[in-house]
Amino acid sequence: MFFLFSKFKLKKWNKLSYEKRFKCFVAVEKKVAKEFNISPIKLELNYDENWNCYGAFSVSSGKKRILLNSRLIEDPRLRFHALETISHETRHAYQFSVVNKDLRWFEFTAKKWKRNWQGYFAASGDSLMYNNQSIERDAQKNSIKFLKRYRWKYRNEKDFKETFDAVFGRYDTADDKARQRYGIFYKWKIERNIRKKSRENN
C-alpha cells in the first residue's frame, strides 16, 4: 500500500499491464472505502465507447458496484481522473449506506441526501442541477480533498495538474452558474427542485 500511489507516476504507469492497473484501482478503492468505514465496492469496467462519463455507482438487487470507463485504464493521461472517480463514486457508496438506515430527527445532512437520492438529477440531463445537488457537491468536495493529499507527490506530473484543475474548476464554477440562473436564493431553489422531483418519484 505504501508504494501504491507511486505507481501512478507516468514512468511507472506506462510499464504496467491493464491487469495491474486495474489491481491498482481496486487497491485505491479499498483504501477509500476503509476511510469511510464501509465495505469495499466491486469495480467493473465499461467498454462502451459511447459512454460519456468516467464512472458511476449503482445498486441492483442489493449488489453494489462502481462502473469505470475502460478509457481510465487504456489512456495513461486519465490515470488521475481514475483516482478522482474512484474516490467520488466510493463517496456515493458511503452516502448510500448513510441514508439507508433509520435516521434520527437531527440528522439533517443525511435526510437531505436521502431526498436527493429519491430526486436525483442525472448528468445526462440538467448539468447545472446535477453539479449543484447535495450528494454531488459532497462527492466532488471529498474527491478534491482526496487529490489534494497527493499534490506534492505528483508535483512534476503534468496530467495531475490538468486533472486537479479540471475537477476543482467544475466544483468552483458550479455556484456561479447556479446563481446566474436562480439568483441569490439559488441554493433554496435547487433544493426545492430536488424536493419536487423526490415527491414525484415516490
Regions found by a protein language model. Name each.
Residues 18-39:
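Zn2+-dependent metallopeptidase catalytic core
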Residues 37, 44-67, 76-78:
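Catalytic zinc-binding patch centered on the HExxH motif and its immediate surroundings
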Residues 84-97, 139:
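Active-site recognition of the HExxH zinc-binding catalytic motif
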